[in-house]
Every structure is written in C-alpha cells, then in structure tokens.
Amino acid sequence: MIISHRHRYLFVELPRTGSTAIRDELCGFYDGEPILSKHATYQEFLGAASVDEKRYFVFSAIRNPLDDAVSRYFKLRTDHKGRFSHARPGGHRRLVNRLLDNAMFGFLRRTDADFPTFFLRYYVLPYDTWASLSHRRFDFVMRFENLAADFEKALRQIGIEPVRPLALVNPTGARQRDFAYYYPPETWGRARRVFGPYMEKWGYGFPAEWGIQGPSTLHRAQYLLCGLVARFYWRVVRPLT
C-alpha cells in the first residue's frame, strides 16, 4: 500500500494487477511511500488512518480472472523469483495464501502439470478477490489490460502530470500467449461457473469463440454465498494472520 501526503492519494495493491510497477513509479517519481503491508486492504488502512487521510484520493486495479489464473500458474511453475522454493517465513503473503501456494507449487513440481490440469484441480469454488470489499468505493479503478493508460488517467485525476510512461516490472516468465490460448474447450464450463459471476460484476466477458453468455442464476447464488464467507475472512481473519 502506497500513500502520498503531498499529493493526497492512496494506492491499494491487489495482487497480480501490476501493483509492483505502479508502486515503483509512485515511490520513485510521485512522492509515494509504503505503509502497512504491500497487500493490505483498504479496511486495514481505515483502521489506522487519520480523519484527513480518509479523504485522500484512493485508487487500485482489477484484472480479468481468466488472465489472472494463467499468470498465477506460470508464476508457480517457474518459481517466480524463488518466491515459492525460498519463501521467507511470514512476509506479505498471508497464512492461507502461503498454504495454498505451497500446495500448488508442490503439485506442479511433482507432476509438471499443464494449465488445464492445474486449473481443473484448484479452481473449484467461485472466484473472488478482496476487491469485493471496497473497490466500488474507490475514486478510480484501473484495468490491468489497460494499465499504462489508466495509470496516467489516475495521476491526472489526482492532479499530477505523468513524467514518463509506465515501465514494465515483474513480468511472468515462460508465458508467451494470450490467456485464451491456455483454455481448451473442456475447461470452459468450469470457467463459466467459477469466474462468471466475478467477470459479470466487473464488466468482463468470455472470449467470443467460447459461445458463453455469462453465469447462470445458480452460479450467481453460489458466488454470493461463498462471498459471505470470503468477506468474513478478509475483514476479520486475514488481518490476524
């Protein structure tokens, strides 16, 4: 999480949305400074912020979950920056995330599984992120798919003139194609059920060639039910781990 008291902004870092690139730019060129933890939620900030800081311009980013799942797979498969084989105890990853990452990393090391196998094994419950807690309340939400242009828009809304184009930081290794390439037809039904409600919520659509219109009523109900549990975890349990 990055704050600037000079420019009165707060950047909330949702994982795998280009937050490292944004963080580096804000701290290097726009008077930003880290506070709390890298992936602290806005609720955690509100618990520590002054009345004046709560009025700051708040922005973050969102990403298509179809793309996010592929990125996660390749980060695990390539042991991105030794993050999984040499993970530090604690760190900015919370306990549940570390346990899940360790399980996924171990599975890929043992099996060398391709993405469809990985996806069908680990993407079972409705997909959600803690963007569902408060992103709707933010002043601006960037799209990972249009990150450089959206970052410039955010800066100008804050009242800052960009000093340079956004630099690419922390790219996922080994991945060479658009996310749709990694989803064969046997994964489409699962993707619709797991990702559909979240994609609908944030205005994403499935690739046209899939012929998928969106989630069913049952899928939406499952998403809402699981979301109750997820929000309790993000609000109450996650800050303690």
List the predicted regions and their residue ranges.
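Membrane-interface amphipathic segments in extracytoplasmic regions
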Residues: M1-T241
